């Protein structure tokens, strides 16, 4: 498949042109024209690129790519090394950020809900769905369940939360800023990837459980689902690589 055809295929599936994002979605660094072997991962880190080189990949597809708004345009150090690896080895880099958060089938939010057994009921605002657990559980039990499903112990704050958690809102990655919207909506718990200092105060003062389960851990689902979709719908050789990241 041509690299431009792969871009068009994913763009159409994820409806990527409809998003105003923090960076470009699609083909970010052009490599060889023909693509057959693809490595996917959460972030285009040097470790992921090195694995792509080791496996003679034609392309890398990630959720966190390059060229974010307001980042320095200077190419030196870590940024130089990453781009040099791609260009010297003629590897294409594709990045899909918000389109891979929001997709109703492959998106990070939907995939996290499926992993945790949450039935999606609706959306509080864009990128912030809410839903219900199959049965109410204590806050500590939900923390243990999140750890079991994601392989990472979440930071949990439940000082003033209800005895049992049933209604849950969530936003994968760095979604802690949505906690106030979730509280106003009236959920029992809010799950995201990251935590800020003020997040805990918001949780305590508004009476809900808060779980920071890891930016990386909560956003493996989308790129993994996209990998599976490509495998099922094309003849491409696609391999998801999980580069460990505790953050």
Regions found by a protein language model. Name each.
Residues 1-247:
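Hydrophobic structural segments
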């Amino acid at each position: 498949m041509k690299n431009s055809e792969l871009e068009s295929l994913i763009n159409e599936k994820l409806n990527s042109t409809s998003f105003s994002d923090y960076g470009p979605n699609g083909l970010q660094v052009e490599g060889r024209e023909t693509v057959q072997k693809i490595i996917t991962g959460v972030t285009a880190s040097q470790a992921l690129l090195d694995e792509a080189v080791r496996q003679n990949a034609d392309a890398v597809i990630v959720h966190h790519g390059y060229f974010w708004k307001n980042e320095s345009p200077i190419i030196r150090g870590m940024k130089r090394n990453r781009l040099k690896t791609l260009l010297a080895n003629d590897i294409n880099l594709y990045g899909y950020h918000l389109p891979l958060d929001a997709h109703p089938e492959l998106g990070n939010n939907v995939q996290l809900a499926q992993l945790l057994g949450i039935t999606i009921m609706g959306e509080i605002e864009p990128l912030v769905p809410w839903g219900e657990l199959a049965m109410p559980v204590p806050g500590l039990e939900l923390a243990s369940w999140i750890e079991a499903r994601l392989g990472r112990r979440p930071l949990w704050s439940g000082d003033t939360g209800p005895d049992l958690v049933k209604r849950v809102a969530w936003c994968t990655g760095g979604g802690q800023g949505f906690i106030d919207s979730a509280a106003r909506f009236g959920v029992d718990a809010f799950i995201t990837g990251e935590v800020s200092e003020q997040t805990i105060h918001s949780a305590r003062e508004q009476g809900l459980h808060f779980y920071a389960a890891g930016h990386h851990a909560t956003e493996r689902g989308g790129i993994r689902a996209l990998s599976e979709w490509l495998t099922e719908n094309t003849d491409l050789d696609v391999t998801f690589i999980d580069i460990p990241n505790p953050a």
